[in-house]
């Protein structure tokens, strides 16, 4: 038998997996009910409250999770670009592979950045700003961009990050033509 803390963590992860599973079946986070998430996770609805105060808190934890994955991906890309002298094609491949490996997380991110839950939208907006700031700092290290000031680099980073976020739906469910 598992220790209580480990069992609690497994149930918490089961609730997160259940929410992602329901969203992979075509549902938006805002349309999920606490009862159906709990049922899908195999627990009674009142058990949900041992792990999350409400559905908004579950959504915020899901944003945090995809944020960690996204930022770890950016670190891989950064390592490829700066440490290994990588090329853009390789960096794009790294990103696409991570999105494919974590499809449910990125599906959540793609859908909920404009979804119905205000707290989740705000958390995703903050994540996008953090990623933009990280990228702007990285861009200062690129010799080809030395002529740009901090504001110019931030605008460039903002455009790149917003483009990536906007194209997530096509990356997750590509149109008929194949991705690189």
Show which residues each predicted segment covers.
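N-terminal intrinsically disordered/low-complexity leader segments
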Residues: 1-10, 149
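Hydrophobic alpha-helical connector segments
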Residues: 75-101, 157-160
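Helix-turn-helix
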Residues: 14, 25-57, 61
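Short helix-capping/turn signature of helix-turn-helix
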Residues: 52, 111-116
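Alpha-helical DNA-contacting segments of helix-turn-helix folds
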Residues: 59-66, 109, 131
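Generic hydrophobic, amphipathic alpha-helix propensity
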Residues: 7-19, 37, 62-70
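Amphipathic C-terminal alpha-helical segment
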Residues: 98-101, 137, 157-179
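Amphipathic alpha-helical packing segments from all-alpha helical-bundle domains
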Residues: 118-144, 154-161, 165-166
